[in-house]
Amino acid sequence: MVGKMWPVLWTLCAVRVTVDAISVETPQDVLRASQGKSVTLPCTYHTSTSSREGLIQWDKLLLTHTERVVIWPFSNKNYIHGELYKNRVSISNNAEQSDASITIDQLTMADNGTYECSVSLMSDLEGNTKSRVRLLVLVPPSKPECGIEGETIIGNNIQLTCQSKEGSPTPQYSWKRYNILNQEQPLAQPASGQPVSLKNISTDTSGYYICTSSNEEGTQFCNITVAVRSPSMNVALYVGIAVGVVAALIIIGIIIYCCCCRGKDDNTEDKEDARPNREAYEEPPEQLRELSREREEEDDYRQEEQRSTGRESPDHLDQ
């Protein structure tokens, strides 16, 4: 009798586990949203328990580590944001009714990646508690930068490069070529993102090359003018540069020499100004002799006047 009951007991246990086991799902594998906009990452959970003691957690999965997006406890409903998601992430208003979705605002290219939704309930720890969704932020290509690698001299090999620093999905690149008469010319297309290789170039290689960078969000362009020259022109260019450098050095030398001479003249003038000006207070000998005679005459006059005064004094007393 007991042996016959074992299958029934196992069935009841299996049913109980199935009923209590939590199930977390993300209905979409990939979501697309434009840069600067908002996106809702959907996530739902199913459980037979009515208790909501636990939390909802979202993380971004990186190659080397996990980056926290947000933790939302059922008990106090207080957000615990990751550093890069403060004031940008909010949980669904129906979080307690099986909706664990989040909304991310102000999307940037850095938000590209895979996100994991996790629901943990203390009363239902069995089952599938996690699910993932990939977010692709759509960004139009930035204006590409065009460049030439190598010297545009007849017989050389050169490469034309084109690269947008931003763009999601990754921009696709294409090239067009026009001669100096603005007529489109054939051009072998490289693999997208690879440079255009031009080998053994000649004057026929000269012209305008236009690169187009595009994805589903937009298109941008850049262009290069290729002017192929002969080696003799290259030598003339170097000679011209050398002459210019020598001339500049000569001019600089002249300026330095003039400044030094001017400095010496200024020092000489300062020294002369510092010497006492003897002419200002030395009188010529003739003037000194004249002054001496005038002083002698003045002294004689005073002595004579004193003698005269002495003779007249008795008469004045008698009167």
Swiss-Prot record:
Lineage: Eukaryota, Metazoa, Chordata, Craniata, Vertebrata
Residues passing through the membrane, by range: 236-256
Signal peptide as annotated in the record: 1-21
Span of domain Ig-like V-type: 22-134
GO MF: signaling receptor activity
Any one of the GO CC terms: plasma membrane
Intrachain S-S bonds: C43-C117, C146-C222, C162-C211
Ig-like C2-type domain boundaries: 140-227
Protein's name according to its UniProt entry: Cell surface A33 antigen
Gene3D superfamilies given in the database record: Immunoglobulins
Superkingdom of origin organism: Eukaryota
Positions bearing carbohydrate: N112, N200, N223
